[in-house]
Amino acid sequence: MSAPAAGPPAAAPGDGAPQGPPNLTSNRRLQQTQAQVDEVVDIMRVNVDKVLERDTKLSELDDRADALQAGASQFETSAAKLKRKYWWKNMKMMIIMGVICAIILIIIIVYFST
């Protein structure tokens, strides 16, 4: 009987078992993949920062739009009151003018009828 050889068994030439140099290429691929992952993570961080910044700007814009809406509503109310005020003022002037014309007409009629 022969004693078994100590150490790893020898691989056959067509066996396809990984050798030293392919291990280096797998490390290189792993490093490239890790670099790509790091790049994607950096891009995603930038995108998240942009989204948060956009959200802040949209919130500010929404607040400004609400304030503008409130101002527009107040302006509309004030404009309606002002329109009503000047309409009544115009009516008063028309009534006064009508009364003055009626008085003048009555004076003329009375003056010429006697």
Swiss-Prot record:
<protein>
    <recommendedName>
        <fullName>Vesicle-associated membrane protein 2</fullName>
    </recommendedName>
</protein>
<comment type="function">
    <text>Involved in the targeting and/or fusion of transport vesicles to their target membrane. Major SNARE protein of synaptic vesicles which mediates fusion of synaptic vesicles to release neurotransmitters. Essential for fast vesicular exocytosis and activity-dependent neurotransmitter release as well as fast endocytosis that mediates rapid reuse of synaptic vesicles.</text>
</comment>
<feature type="topological domain" description="Vesicular">
    <location>
        <begin position="112"/>
        <end position="114"/>
    </location>
</feature>
<keyword id="KW-0175">Coiled coil</keyword>
<dbReference type="GO" id="GO:0048488">
    <property type="term" value="P:synaptic vesicle endocytosis"/>
</dbReference>
<dbReference type="GO" id="GO:0005484">
    <property type="term" value="F:SNAP receptor activity"/>
</dbReference>
<feature type="region of interest" description="Disordered">
    <location>
        <begin position="1"/>
        <end position="31"/>
    </location>
</feature>
<feature type="domain" description="v-SNARE coiled-coil homology">
    <location>
        <begin position="29"/>
        <end position="89"/>
    </location>
</feature>
<keyword id="KW-0472">Membrane</keyword>
<dbReference type="Pfam" id="PF00957">
    <property type="entry name" value="Synaptobrevin"/>
</dbReference>
<keyword id="KW-1003">Cell membrane</keyword>
<dbReference type="GO" id="GO:0035493">
    <property type="term" value="P:SNARE complex assembly"/>
</dbReference>
<keyword id="KW-0812">Transmembrane</keyword>
<dbReference type="GO" id="GO:0006906">
    <property type="term" value="P:vesicle fusion"/>
</dbReference>
<comment type="similarity">
    <text>Belongs to the synaptobrevin family.</text>
</comment>
<dbReference type="GO" id="GO:0005886">
    <property type="term" value="C:plasma membrane"/>
</dbReference>
<feature type="modified residue" description="N-acetylserine">
    <location>
        <position position="2"/>
    </location>
</feature>
<dbReference type="InterPro" id="IPR042855">
    <property type="entry name" value="V_SNARE_CC"/>
</dbReference>
<dbReference type="InterPro" id="IPR016444">
    <property type="entry name" value="Synaptobrevin/VAMP"/>
</dbReference>
<feature type="compositionally biased region" description="Pro residues">
    <location>
        <begin position="1"/>
        <end position="11"/>
    </location>
</feature>
<keyword id="KW-0770">Synapse</keyword>
<feature type="transmembrane region" description="Helical; Anchor for type IV membrane protein">
    <location>
        <begin position="93"/>
        <end position="111"/>
    </location>
</feature>
<keyword id="KW-1133">Transmembrane helix</keyword>
<dbReference type="GO" id="GO:0016079">
    <property type="term" value="P:synaptic vesicle exocytosis"/>
</dbReference>
<dbReference type="InterPro" id="IPR001388">
    <property type="entry name" value="Synaptobrevin-like"/>
</dbReference>
<dbReference type="GO" id="GO:0031201">
    <property type="term" value="C:SNARE complex"/>
</dbReference>
<keyword id="KW-0007">Acetylation</keyword>
<keyword id="KW-0968">Cytoplasmic vesicle</keyword>
<dbReference type="GO" id="GO:0030672">
    <property type="term" value="C:synaptic vesicle membrane"/>
</dbReference>
<dbReference type="GO" id="GO:0017075">
    <property type="term" value="F:syntaxin-1 binding"/>
</dbReference>
<feature type="topological domain" description="Cytoplasmic">
    <location>
        <begin position="2"/>
        <end position="92"/>
    </location>
</feature>
